[in-house]
Each structure stands twice: as C-alpha cells, then as structure tokens.
C-alpha cells in the first residue's frame, strides 16, 4: 500500500499529476487545493497518498496536507461518497470551511457543492458531525480571495470545472465575464471561477 510518494513532478493539471519516482511515473489524482501548492514541473514534490484498490484498478489520490488526507478518508466513509466525489468536494471547499459547515449543519453551503444534493448534505452532517468534532481541524467560514486570469488557461479551467460537475455553458459564461490579465495563473482562475460559481 503506497502511503507517500516523493519524486520529480513530471506533469501537472488541475485534477491529476504524474510523479516520476526513479523512472516510474505514478498518476495521482488531486484536489484543487493541492494543485495550488505544487511546485513547477521538473521540481521535486512529495505527497501523502491514499491508495484506492478495486478489483480492476488501483487509483492513487495525493494530498499536500495531513488535514486534507484525513478529511478525504472521513468523507469516503459516508455511504454514497466514493474517492472521486470526495476529491471533488475538497476541490470546492477547504477542510476548515467544510468542518464548519458540517458542525453547524449548514445544508445550504454543503448542497452548493457540485454533485452534493440535499440528501447527501444531510448524510454528511448526520454521519460526520461527531467524527469532525474529534478531528484536529479548526472550523472556519473564511473564503479565499479571488484573482483574475488570462484567456489562455480558460480551456484547462473549464475542463476541470466540468469534471467537477458544473455545466459547461455556465462555466464558459462565468469565464467570459471574468476580467482578463496576462500573466495570471491557472490556480488564480480556478479560485475566482469557483468563488463566482458557488455564490
């Protein structure tokens, strides 16, 4: 069972990266919050890994922080939530804000996450409130500050957001209305687009 990978960051995209470890490339799925913290391609990266084993496949999920990995493992303990949905949840909300929403029973905030309906939000609160209370995560409702982004990253951002469950027409409309500055990063576009989409 792989618990951590350290190697060269051979490739990165908003939802997955490839880590080269002694000539072997490992594809690791990641949440946006981990993507924001990645070094440039060619640099060394080290991630905590959750290994998901199925009959026909092994999938790796990587996290920069222990809190993210712990929350991921707690999320997949909820009935109806698999690894991909758990990853997508953490792409849309920081662990501290998620903890706050669960502890406060904030169904409106939880159900605003793509793929999470009212019933799933209720299950999150019902099944995780006590677990979250015991976790070492300070609840918060703080939101990340928005940034502006260049048009050349729009396709990557749109693809990532569609994979998270947003409708492409809505995503494209939001991206078209965002102010454009050359030199802004993909991470900045994702942050701003998510902030607008979750209003």
UniProtKB/Swiss-Prot annotation:
Main location: cytoplasm
Keyword DNA repair: yes
Subcellular location: Cytoplasm
Record GO biological process: DNA recombination; DNA repair
Alphabetical list of InterPro entries matching this protein: DNA_helicase_Holl-junc_RuvA_I, Hlx-hairpin-Hlx_DNA-bd_motif, NA-bd_OB-fold, RuvA, RuvA_2-like, RuvA_C, RuvA_C_sf
Keyword entries, A-Z: Cytoplasm, DNA damage, DNA recombination, DNA repair, DNA-binding
GO cellular component: cytoplasm; Holliday junction helicase complex; Holliday junction resolvase complex
Region (Flexible linker) location: 144-154
Alphabetized Pfam families for the sequence: HHH_5, RuvA_C, RuvA_N
Positions of region (Domain III): 154-199
Ranges annotated as spanning the membrane: none
Domain statement: Has three domains with a flexible linker between the domains II and III and assumes an 'L' shape. Domain III is highly mobile and contacts RuvB.
Subunit structure: Homotetramer. Forms an RuvA(8)-RuvB(12)-Holliday junction (HJ) complex. HJ DNA is sandwiched between 2 RuvA tetramers; dsDNA enters through RuvA and exits via RuvB. An RuvB hexamer assembles on each DNA strand where it exits the tetramer. Each RuvB hexamer is contacted by two RuvA subunits (via domain III) on 2 adjacent RuvB subunits; this complex drives branch migration. In the full resolvosome a probable DNA-RuvA(4)-RuvB(12)-RuvC(2) complex forms which resolves the HJ.
Family: Belongs to the RuvA family.
Function field: The RuvA-RuvB-RuvC complex processes Holliday junction (HJ) DNA during genetic recombination and DNA repair, while the RuvA-RuvB complex plays an important role in the rescue of blocked DNA replication forks via replication fork reversal (RFR). RuvA specifically binds to HJ cruciform DNA, conferring on it an open structure. The RuvB hexamer acts as an ATP-dependent pump, pulling dsDNA into and through the RuvAB complex. HJ branch migration allows RuvC to scan DNA until it finds its consensus sequence, where it cleaves and resolves the cruciform DNA.
Name of protein: Holliday junction branch migration complex subunit RuvA
Organism for this UniProt entry: Geobacter metallireducens (strain ATCC 53774 / DSM 7210 / GS-15)
Classification lineage: Bacteria, Pseudomonadati, Thermodesulfobacteriota, Desulfuromonadia, Geobacterales
């Amino acid at each position: 069972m792989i618990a951590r990978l350290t190697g060269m960051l051979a490739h990165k995209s908003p939802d997955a990266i490839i880590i080269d470890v002694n000539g072997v490339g490992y594809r690791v799925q990641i949440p946006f919050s981990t993507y924001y913290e990645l070094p440039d391609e060619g640099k060394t990266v080290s991630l905590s890994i959750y290994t998901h084993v199925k009959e026909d496949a092994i999938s790796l999920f990587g996290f920069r922080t222990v809190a993210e990995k712990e929350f991921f493992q707690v999320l997949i303990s909820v009935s109806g939530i698999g690894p991909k949905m758990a990853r997508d949840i953490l792409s849309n909300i920081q662990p501290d804000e998620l903890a706050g929403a669960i502890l406060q029973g904030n169904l409106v905030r939880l159900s605003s996450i793509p793929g999470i309906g009212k019933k799933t939000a209720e299950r999150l609160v019902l099944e995780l409130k006590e677990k979250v209370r015991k976790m070492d995560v300070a609840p918060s409702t703080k939101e990340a500050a928005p940034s502006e982004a260049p048009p050349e990253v729009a396709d990557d951002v749109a693809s990532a957001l569609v994979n998270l469950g947003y409708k492409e027409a809505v995503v494209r409309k939001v991206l078209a209305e965002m102010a454009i500055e050359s030199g802004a990063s993909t991470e900045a576009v994702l942050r701003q687009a998510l902030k607008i989409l979750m209003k």
